[in-house]
Amino acid sequence: MAAKEVKFHSDARERMLRGVDVLANAVKVTLGPKGRNVVIDKSFGAPRITKDGVSVAKEIELEDKFENMGAQMLREVASKTNDLAGDGTTTATVLAQAIVKEGAKAVASGMNPMDLKRGIDLAVDAVVGELKANARKISNNSEIAQVGTISANGDAEIGRYLAEAMEKVGNEGVITVEEAKTAETELEVVEGMQFDRGYLSPYFVTNQDKMRVELEDPYILIHEKKLSNLQSMLPVLEAVVQSGKPLLIIAEDVEGEALATLVVNKLRGGLKIAAVKAPGFGDRRKAMLEDIAILTAGTVISEDLGIKLENVTLNMLGRAKKVAIEKENTTIIDGAGSKAELDGRTAQIRAQIEETTSDYDREKLQERLAKLAGGVAVIRVGGSTEVEVKEKKDRVDDALHATRAAVEEGILPGGGVALLRAVKALDSIKTANDDQRVGVDIVRRAIEAPVRQIAENAGAEGSIIVGKLREKSDFSYGWNAQTGEYGDLYAQGVIDPAKVVRTALQDAASVAGLLVTTEAMIAEKPKKEAAPAMPAGAGMDF
C-alpha cells in the first residue's frame, strides 16, 4: 500500500478552499445574461466554447491532491444540481463557494463546525419554504418561452422553439435536441413513443460519443417471453440479414447464449442489431407491447395467440423510420402503423381512463396515451461552425430542463432576486445557541452571491445593486442585467424555475456543509521520480 499524506485542521481547510476557489472562479464567470464564455481545450478537434457551468466544472482537475479534493467536492454540487433540475449549476457553485468561505472563517475563529452546519441547514429549510410559498404557477406559453430564453442566455429563438415544442407534444411529451445539417435551427414533431428500458449490452452502441444505439429503418421483433437461445429465431434472423435492415428485439429478457450470440454477430458486422427488455410488468407489459405493435404495424409474438418464434415471418415484424436507444430509455420514431389503428387504440385507452376507479391505473393509462398520441419533438440546432453548434446545443439542453422544471414547480423572479427576497424567512428562526445563529447568518450573506456575481459579470458593482434592491420590499422587484434597468422582473420576463433555484441552494448547502465540517484530509503521497540511470561508459576515458 502506498504511503499517505495527512493534513489536519486549518491546513486541510486552506488547501481545500484553494481548490474550491479555482473551480468556482472558472465557473462563475458564465453566470447571468452577460456571462462570459469559457474555452475548453480538447485533445482532438476544435476547442469547445461553453457557458454551461457543469461542463466547465467537469473539465477541472488539479495537480495538488488536497486542492483537487476541494474542487471535486464542489464539482459534485454542479453535477447533482444538473441531474435533479438540469440547470442552475453555476448558481449552485457560486452559493457553495460563498457558504464554504464564510463557514471556514467562522471555524477559524473557534466556532463549532457541527453547530454551524445545523444553523446552515435550518436557514436553507426556511429559505426553501419561502421560495415555495412565493412560486407562481406557469399560466401561458409566453412564460414558458421566457424561461427558455433566460436559461439559453437570452436567446429568444431557443425560448420560442421550446414553447412551441411543449405546446405540440404536451408537457409530458418527449423533446430531443440534435445537431442540424444546416445553419438554421428548426423544430420537427415526429410521431413516436418512448419507454424506460435501455440497451441490454453496451456492445450494441453505434454512436460512441453519445453512448446510444441508432437504428435507421429497422425491423422490430416484439416477443413477450424470454429469449435464452436463438435456435428458434434463426429463420427470421436469416430473413432480416438478407433484407440488409437492422433489427431491434423487444423481449421480456435476452440472456445467456442468445445475448452472447447477438453481441458477437454485431461486433463481426454481420448484423446490425440491438435488444431491449419489454417495458412494464405483468398485464401492463402485454398492453404496452400491444401498443408498440400497433404503432409499428407489427405483431406481438405470443404463445397465447398460438404464434411460435420459428414460424415468424418478416411481415409479422414491426417497422419504424428510426429507433434511438440510450442507457435507460428507447424511442421509436415514426412507426409504420396505420392512423386508423392508432386512433382506435387511443380511443380504447381513453375509454379505460374514464372507467377506472384506481388513481394508479389512471396515471399509468395516461402515460400510455401520452406515449401513443404525444409524439416526439426534435429541435435541430444549426450554426455556421461545429463549435457554434455545440455551444448552442448546450444552451438548448439547459433551457429544455429549465422549462420542464418551471412547469413542474412554478416560476420565481430571476437574476438571483428570489433568493435575496427570501432572506426575510431567516428572521423568525429560533436557534439553540450562538454558533447555530452564525450558521444562519452565513446563509444570509451567501444568498446575495448570485446577484453580486450577475452584476459583476455585467460590468456593474454588485454591492450597489444589492443595496438598491434592499430598499424595496416587493418580491418581484429586481435588476435586469440585460437592460441595466430596475423594475418588476415578472413583467420584464426575467424569471427562473422555482425548482432550479431550490435545488441549487439545497445542493450547495449540502456539499458546503460537508466541506465546513472537514477536519482531516488523506491523499496518496506524490511519488518521487527516480533519477535517470547513468549511461554506460559515461565519464570513462577510453
UniProtKB/Swiss-Prot annotation:
UniProt enzyme class: isomerase
Major subcellular site: cytoplasm
Tagged with keyword Nucleus: no
Any one cellular-component term (Gene Ontology): cytoplasm
Catalytic activity: ATP + H2O + a folded polypeptide = ADP + phosphate + an unfolded polypeptide
InterPro entries per the UniProt record, alphabetical: Chaperonin_Cpn60_CS, Cpn60/GroEL, Cpn60/GroEL/TCP-1, GroEL-like_apical_dom_sf, GROEL-like_equatorial_sf, TCP-1-like_intermed_sf
Gene Ontology BP, a term: protein refolding
Subcellular localization: Cytoplasm
Keyword set includes Zinc-finger: no
Amino acids binding ATP: T30, L31, G32, P33, K51, D87, G88, T89, T90, T91, G415, D496
Oligomer and partners: Forms a cylinder of 14 subunits composed of two heptameric rings stacked back-to-back. Interacts with the co-chaperonin GroES.
Protein name: Chaperonin GroEL 2
Organism, as annotated: Rhizobium etli (strain ATCC 51251 / DSM 11541 / JCM 21823 / NBRC 15573 / CFN 42)
Lineage start: Bacteria, Pseudomonadati, Pseudomonadota, Alphaproteobacteria, Hyphomicrobiales
